Amino acid sequence: MSEGITDIEESQIQTNYDKVVYKFDDMELDENLLRGVFGYGFEEPSAIQQRAIMPIIEGHDVLAQAQSGTGKTGTFSIAALQRIDTSVKAPQALMLAPTRELALQIQKVVMALAFHMDIKVHACIGGTSFVEDAEGLRDAQIVVGTPGRVFDNIQRRRFRTDKIKMFILDEADEMLSSGFKEQIYQIFTLLPPTTQVVLLSATMPNDVLEVTTKFMRNPVRILVKKDELTLEGIKQFYVNVEEEEYKYECLTDLYDSISVTQAVIFCNTRRKVEELTTKLRNDKFTVSAIYSDLPQQERDTIMKEFRSGSSRILISTDLLARGIDVQQVSLVINYDLPANKENYIHRIGRGGRFGRKGVAINFVTNEDVGAMRELEKFYSTQIEELPSDIATLLN
């Protein structure tokens, strides 16, 4: 039985692990996995990734409390991919989610991260035929699914569990409150006794604590509080630039019509940051550029210069979107819409923290319109078309 688990208050667990790894490069990940991580758009690990990836890779049972939008899926997906033996063509990691939509979303993330690896991922969910399951389960190394369908397949002997070494429960609180408790318990009993258990949950009700007591061995406990970011006080606009090639012209036109002390411009790739920096410098703008490959010392110098006002424009990848406060910035420009929806609030929150007002302008191509509508839905917000009197908004 896991020591001390039953004494934890329902609202929050106590962290008992304090190791933090700040860079993916320092996690000793498989080279092809690392390529997938950077290719997916992750640059620097989020708070939960800095704390939970390593203990999972090391084989500890892990109980992590974190809200959605903190990088949980990336956490257990990266750790699971690192632990998979690619030479074994049988299920080695089982990931459970409360809904088929979430299971499909997880499968998509795992497959993207495993793009350069020889790993097969099967989604075991309702709405597909058992024949498809039988095919997919034969040689998939990672299975993502909903409890009912997974249990059904194990019972029908389509899903061999003898090689399973990791059992991951995402959104455990939701899963247990949705009446899956019995099935989850039954699945547990059908896995090898040495299976590592990883449980992620936003809250810690008794149902979840009971599972940890029954099935986890001295788990590493990690609590990550979500950044209290809000879009309040930030005016959000978009400019339809139609095609990618018109973005630069639009940016310089914008700068001709407004007077801004400082701005942060976000691009999705290092290459784009470098290209934009060169163009703006050629047009006599004072620009700094920052991305994750830069040595820490150089990054610190660039940030210092920007804070002191000696450069007016800071161009960055999503590295800056978390954890670096630039309080004096009143304008954020998303030259590219973020690849991950969660990064939107981290990017534009720059100008709006500490009660300061801010303006965010999104450059949107015809292809981006759908993604922008998704952002509006995700954050229950509205992004208006940029008005012609933009200058008055920034003064």
From Swiss-Prot:
Residues with N-acetylserine modification: S2
Residues with Phosphoserine modification: S77, S129
Native source organism of the sequence: Saccharomyces cerevisiae (strain ATCC 204508 / S288c)
Name of this protein: ATP-dependent RNA helicase eIF4A
Classification lineage: Eukaryota, Fungi, Dikarya, Ascomycota, Saccharomycotina
Binding-site positions, ATP: A66, Q67, S68, G69, T70, G71, K72, T73
Keywords noted in UniProt: Acetylation, ATP-binding, Cytoplasm, Helicase, Hydrolase, Initiation factor, Nucleotide-binding, Phosphoprotein, Protein biosynthesis, RNA-binding
Motif (Q motif): 22-50
GO CC entries: cytoplasm; cytoplasmic stress granule; eukaryotic translation initiation factor 4F complex; plasma membrane; ribosome
Chief place where the protein resides: cytoplasm
